[in-house]
Amino acid sequence: MAKVRILIFTLVLFFSLNVHIHGFYLPGVAPQDFQMGDALMVKVNKLTSTKTQLPYSYYSLPYCRPEHIVDSAENLGEVLRGDRIENSPFVFKMRESQMCAAVCRVKLDKKTAKAFKEKIADEYRVNMILDNLPLVVPVQRPDQDNVVVYQHGFHVGLKGIFAGKKEEKYFIHNHLTFTVRYHRDIQTDSSRIVGFEVKPFSVKHEYEGQWNEKARLTTCDPHTKRAVTNSESPQEVEEGNEIIFTYDVDFQESEVKWASRWDTYLLMADDQIHWFSIVNSMMIVLFLSGMVAMIMLRTLYRDISNYNQLESHEEALEETGWKLVHGDVFRPPTNPELLCVYAGTGVQCFGMILVTMIFACLGFLSPSNRGGLMTAMLLLWVFMGLLAGYASSRLYKTLRGTEWKRNALKTAFMFPATVFVAFFVLNAIIWGQKSSGAVPFGTMFALVVLWFGISVPLVFIGGYIGFRKPAPEDPVKTNKIPRQIPTQAWYMNPIFSILIGGILPFGAVFIELFFILTSIWLHQFYYIFGFLFIVFIILIITCAEITVVLCYFQLCSEDYQWWWRSYLTSGSSAVYLFLYAVFYFYTKLEITKLVSAVLYFGYMLIVSYVFFVFTGAIGFYACFWFTRLIYSSVKID
């Protein structure tokens, strides 16, 4: 009867709340309706290159400019990504196609010609935005018929041999054929933009008479319906040449609705690979789960039963294995404060990644919310300082520490300071290259304010709460005199077992890691957080189980120094992550500049460091729970 009343109350509460529920859109991603003839303002973003990894502002090149350049408001994530979104002279009218619209004429001097040549040689791409949709170039996949993939932006130009000449020349894409796809509402006749594509061409424009804004081009003419369809007579980049920038825009009605407009961009042709990755990782998990089950259900049960049935202390001493180290297994490790700091920081990383994954799977961090992912991760990291302080102080008190303020101070500064110094050095390198990817001083100051103003106080609050709580009691008493550790077999060597322990966690994620690195360094879309969340769960289970198994073998060999080894065992997967990053650099990337290589390895070192702290904490807490569980079941006289 009580359950029925609870059910009725729940239903009444639900329907009463449901009356006040209204749908909403995330800021900046709400649909915008356009009537025929409404102005469509195209915005320009950074110039990007996979060869240099150094973004530059669109107007760092002498492109056509509007009368006044206006910077768009950007969130923290966009600034850190190097986005520089500005207005442009490209203005369309909704559902009104244009042909051969002249934007401006630019005469190249030595400096501007050199700037264009450098960007063309480094294969820079121009990025634009219309109604929050990025500009893409549709390209047919050579290995699959009727499969089109979309590339971010269009190349500034191309380099090659033309008209039988022996020397390589530089040619600029000065004519853009835009295609704007829209979905029309029949009832209101309003339209929503669902696609923004371009085909770039290099055309040496010609005109009659003197140049002015209304000069009639002979190479493309809307009056005679002469359109640009190829680059048979390309525009060469050379000092003294004049370049006329033009564009066409064609509006095409589409059946794709606004809510589904990103599906085309995010369509993955590699789903089978992701499923293979998950199945492969699940096999690893099942194998490790079988080993853990065997240890817990057979070996431990038998050992504990036999141990508890021994009649005398002398008989207990004759036993070998993990039971003999019960008087030393909870002896505090060397440098316990550092272990507490890293354990607490690992909990902070875990909380940040977990909540970010949940938000991403719910769609809050979609690509339409540009910069949202990085902004969310930073803010979550700051607020998870509460968990870091709490976890660190709880462990610190368990290890009989007394200076909780010093421990909290180290937790608040050690890991963030290391990452911040590395980030500051890399940012200085980017600044030296005059790249727009350099984080401005104001943003850097905002990061410091978030760190000192929010994260550090939260770490101390968490530390205070954690230290006030009584420390969990050890299941067994610790002997006053440490037990001598016998000579270990070669396969139980700490370095060997630690490195072996990191292979399986890395094996669970390395296929997904390939797609993540590709999205970051080759500027491709990544929005398969469903797959990633499954892999994330598999990684947690794998880290926990492999560390528990190796910890059990270590205790069976009468080595009770498991504290640091448990952290390093799963954390060593970060070593393999960095080695894979090196492999990826030499096999997939075409980076040629030393500065770009330094940036790549610098950022991958930071990522590997975060991965080490995150996976290390998982393995450590798994062993912390495991040792307390098995030794609490042993009867000690």
Curated annotation (Swiss-Prot):
Any one GO CC term of the record: Golgi membrane
Membrane-spanning intervals of the chain: 275-295, 345-365, 371-391, 412-432, 445-465, 495-515, 528-548, 567-587, 594-614
Cytoplasmic side stretches: 296-344, 392-411, 466-494, 549-566, 615-637
Keywords: Endosome, Golgi apparatus, Membrane, Signal, Transmembrane, Transmembrane helix
Presence of the UniProt keyword Signal in the record: yes
Localization (cell): Endosome membrane; Golgi apparatus membrane
Topology of the protein relative to the lipid bilayer: Multi-pass membrane protein
Motif annotated as Endoplasmic reticulum export signal, chain positions: 626-631
Keyword Transmembrane helix attached: yes
InterPro entries tied to this protein: EMP70 (IPR004240)
Broad class of the protein's primary localization: membrane
One Pfam family here: EMP70
Signal peptide location: 1-23
Motif stretch (Golgi retention signal): 635-637
Record topological domains on the Lumenal side: 24-274, 366-370, 433-444, 516-527, 588-593
This protein's domain notes: The C-terminal KXD/E motif functions as a Golgi retention signal, certainly through the binding to the COP1 coatomer.
Family membership noted in the UniProt record: Belongs to the nonaspanin (TM9SF) (TC 9.A.2) family.
Protein name in the entry: Transmembrane 9 superfamily member 10
Organism from which the protein derives: Arabidopsis thaliana (Mouse-ear cress)
